[in-house]
Amino acid sequence: MLNKPEVLIEAITAREILDSRGRPTIEAEVLLETGAFGIAQVPSGASTGSFEAHELRDDDPARYAGKGVLTAVRNVKEKIAPQLLGTNAFDQASIDQKMIDRDGSSNKKELGANAILGVSLATAKAASAELDIPLYRYLGGPLANVLPVPMMNVLNGGSHADNNVDFQEFMIMPVGADSFTEGLRWGAEVFATLSKVLKERKLLSGVGDEGGYAPNLASNQEALDLLIEAIERSNYKPGEQIALAMDVASSEFYKDGQYVYDGSAHSPQEFIDYLAKLVSEYPIISIEDGLQEEDWDNWKLHTQSLGSRIQLVGDDLFVTNPTRLQRGIDLGVANSILIKLNQIGTLTETLETIALATRCQYTSVISHRSGETEDTTIADLAVATRAGQIKTGSLCRSERVAKYNRLLRIEEELGDRALYAPKVGLGPKF
């Protein structure tokens, strides 16, 4: 991050707002002595890993069915603010460490990761506002000029939809485009065509949490077939111009050592073989959470099976946690990590995790959550870190499109300096 002479934090506050699912979340605001300020809104997940930092809820059944966050809001005002007032806003690492120390727990359960993250991000935004530079430039410096390839979740299943599809996300990736702007257009065109395909088959339904269609389908393979048809009918070439990706979210259908999908239970080896078969039959270049989050031995077999052919992303497996990521690196498990700010709870720890992945030649995918807001921080983070990939849902629902629109503005702002990740060898290596 860029540095500047000391500018002190003058005020910190927070409030309870609503996310895209109508559930409460935190909005934090940090004001500097110069009048510059930053506001950040914290997302929330539906399919959550067991090892994520703790999201503090009120558990008061009389308000929002227990989902309120007034306790976390009070923690910002009464515990975090007194600790940070008068602190240099440009010392992000020190600010984040002070909050971690004040919390004192291993998973931020005392103050709440949602409370801590809101202040962490709002501080960075205030600092970038003080310098009058965009957040991606503040975090990434002069090398922050690579636009990510979007992983567009156009068909939803699992915990993200009320349907019978086991796998959670079926995504398209415009890897053959010349720019982010062009890639986004390709994705929007395929999404529109997919709507027509589903309507013709009398499968058109509402959308899931992340804006993708959520029809009832006969199998997970039918979802892939629908994507191929939509791509081809949009006059694009599957695999060459637009590739496929999946978030299997297998922890959600792992029961008693078996993987239960398409109506029956399967052994881990059968499931590994099934995923390999799908990769052989479809232009899939990325699979997320192919095995259950604690099934380390079979994750290793899964990596041996597909790790040299496609990107294998750990989400529930790694939960943006450097300790779990290091274990995966040591064991030879996966080759990519999903990055979700609220899984670890501070900006500094997020950046450290991305740096560890990069050093060890793991790719990073910057990601939203199923419960989102209009906050566009992850768009700036993707450019700042040159991650090369972003997951922020479908081409539907304004909390998803807000991130895409932010990336369009960044690409325009960068002008001739803007690079599209697949064109410079960043993002998936396959």
Curated annotation (Swiss-Prot):
Enzyme Commission number(s): 4.2.1.11
Active site residues according to the UniProt entry: 210 (proton donor), 340 (proton acceptor)
Keyword vocabulary terms for this entry: Cytoplasm, Glycolysis, Lyase, Magnesium, Metal-binding, Secreted
Q: Which cofactor does it need?
A: Mg(2+)
Quote the subcellular location field of this record. Cytoplasm; Secreted; Cell surface
Superkingdom classification of source: Bacteria
Q: Which GO biological process categories is it annotated with?
A: glycolytic process
Q: Which reaction does it catalyse?
A: (2R)-2-phosphoglycerate = phosphoenolpyruvate + H2O
| Biological role | Catalyzes the reversible conversion of 2-phosphoglycerate (2-PG) into phosphoenolpyruvate (PEP). It is essential for the degradation of carbohydrates via glycolysis.
In the record, the note on similarity to other proteins reads: Belongs to the enolase family.
What is the name of this protein?
Enolase
Q: Which organism is it from?
A: Rippkaea orientalis (strain PCC 8801 / RF-1)
Q: Which gene encodes it?
A: eno
